Amino acid sequence: LGDGILGTYGVDAILDCADIRSALTGVVLSANDPVAAWGGVKLLRERFKVEPCAVTGPSTDNAVGVDIIRQQMNVPAFNALSDGAALGDCVIEAIGLAGKFPVVAAP
């Protein structure tokens, strides 16, 4: 939606709109570090009543960051560059599309 939940980016105004929130099927939070992930997840949950289906971004650049997010926030965390397929699978599952399309093997 934008470049930040806070500030002049307008994401907060979008998420404040109940009609838009009700149309969301999945939200992936990208965070720079575990503290930003914590704050982003907290804002999404408490202010906007949105449960993120995953966290990605530089906060997931190492196993420690991934573990902190998963354990402290109880949200799946994946590095999109090194574990993109798992992130995709997580989102597909979260939005209810798992098993609805045939899996095509790569050539």
Describe each PLM feature range:
Residues 3-89:
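Conserved catalytic-core segment of NTP-binding enzymes
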